[in-house]
Amino acid sequence: MDTTQRLLQLTSPALPVGAYSYSEGLEWLVDQGTIDNESHLRTWLLQELAYGSIRMEAAVMVRGYRASTDVQILQYWNAWLSAARETEELRLQSLQMGRSLLRLSKALQDPEHTGPELIEVWEQLQTGCNFAIAFGLTANLWQIPLESATLGYLHSWATNLISAGIKLIPLGQTTGQQLLFQLQPHIEAATQSILLLEDKDLCSCGWGLALASMAHETQYSRLFRS
């Protein structure tokens, strides 16, 4: 079976994991006037792709994919990513989306092809699974090539934040699509870079995102979840 359709399903905005309800600090940045046009949003997204926590998340997703049904490795990277989250808001977002994706993955899995190793993974992760781990595990189960899964992970992240920017700044729909189109070579470059990262290289320079997320937790008026 061509796995392209499965990749499209896994990265679809219609995937019921609640990604649309989060802005990852963008709402506060717009409220403060730090990001108020397409150029500012493009700069923010490019900086995050180059230095931010999305690179770290995607790298952990890669490790979750490679771990397959090795519970110990999955638990290690799941705990590692939870500890690396800068704010409670970002941690709760990751855990909520991961829980939703894990539940969906179980619902779509063919019982005849569900071995004891996979059942154990679901049982061990059901109390708290980061989205990156759930995404990597699901992509592996659906036999999506790792490079495609990594590209899709970054593309869906960019799509979600551009959609948030369209609502918040606001921007036109065409402008949003132009921005996503312009980001494509940068997403491709980030994909290739992330696939080559060794464990010792995993890090992020996400203090701007961390401060925005912390402020968003107590922002008086919000469209997006905290």
From Swiss-Prot:
InterPro entries hit by this protein: UreF, UreF_sf
Subcellular location, record wording: Cytoplasm
One MF annotation (Gene Ontology) recorded for this entry: nickel cation binding
Record's keyword terms, sorted: Chaperone, Cytoplasm, Nickel insertion
Main location: cytoplasm
Glycoprotein as UniProt keyword: no
A GO cellular-component term linked to this record: cytoplasm
Any Pfam family: UreF
Subunit (UniProt): UreD, UreF and UreG form a complex that acts as a GTP-hydrolysis-dependent molecular chaperone, activating the urease apoprotein by helping to assemble the nickel containing metallocenter of UreC. The UreE protein probably delivers the nickel.
Family per similarity comment: Belongs to the UreF family.
The protein's role, per its UniProt record: Required for maturation of urease via the functional incorporation of the urease nickel metallocenter.
This protein's name: Urease accessory protein UreF
The organism of origin for this protein: Acaryochloris marina (strain MBIC 11017)
Name of the coding gene: ureF
